[in-house]
Regions:
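Conserved PLP-enzyme active-site core in the AAT-like
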Residues: 1-184
Length: 184
């Protein structure tokens, strides 16, 4: 995100995000001169008030980790897109198999391939997806200059995980549904 956001600009992030994300925003981004505002995304008015001309991205997870909070993605896309900011989601918790963020108005989606996509806890990596041409060009330029490319073996391990992603998540969902019914 520091390639999309420049010093003097700002990010808005929900408070309820993965600890590594919180550390990245509060320790890395702020040292680069980027202001980071954490807020409760359930408060639409507060979110709207935090977004200004310097806001370049609004970051969230839905469901969030660790709180498992669900956000109305389309509503937040509507709020964010009234500005020049991008709506960015970490989709790791549900994978693209369950939550298709881009179809609900999200501009950029991150996934840790270490989790569901890899599926076997034996790879390290991540992917970034977008359907915005201008974002794609910035990300591709950054990838080419920084060398942010997965090793061939890690790519193979992720491909292997993708073969079983659907069946694994169908079973996860069925088990979660049974548990929810039991707890009602």
């Amino acid at each position: 995100s520091s390639y999309v956001v420049k010093p003097g600009e700002n990010d808005v992030s929900t408070k309820d995000v993965y600890g590594g994300t919180t550390r990245f925003f509060s320790q890395v981004m702020t040292k680069r001169g980027i202001e980071v505002n954490f807020c409760d995304l359930y408060d639409e008015e507060k979110l709207s008030n935090l977004i200004n001309d310097k806001t370049k991205l609004v970051w969230f997870e839905s469901p969030s980790n660790p709180g498992i909070n669900i956000f109305d993605i389309e509503k937040y896309a509507e709020i964010v897109h009234k500005s020049n900011a991008y709506l960015v989601a970490d989709g790791t918790f549900t994978s693209p198999f369950i939550t298709r963020h881009l179809e609900h108005g999200v501009d950029i989606v991150f996934h840790s391939t270490t989790k569901y996509i890899g599926g076997h806890s034996d790879t390290l990596g991540g992917v970034v997806t977008t359907n915005k041409e201008d974002v794609w060009e910035k990300l591709y330029e950054y990838q080419k200059t920084s060398g942010g490319i997965m090793s061939p073996f890690d790519a193979y391990l992720c491909q292997r995980g993708l073969y079983t992603l659907g069946p694994r998540l169908v079973m996860h969902s069925a088990n979660a549904h049974k548990l929810a019914e039991y707890l009602e």
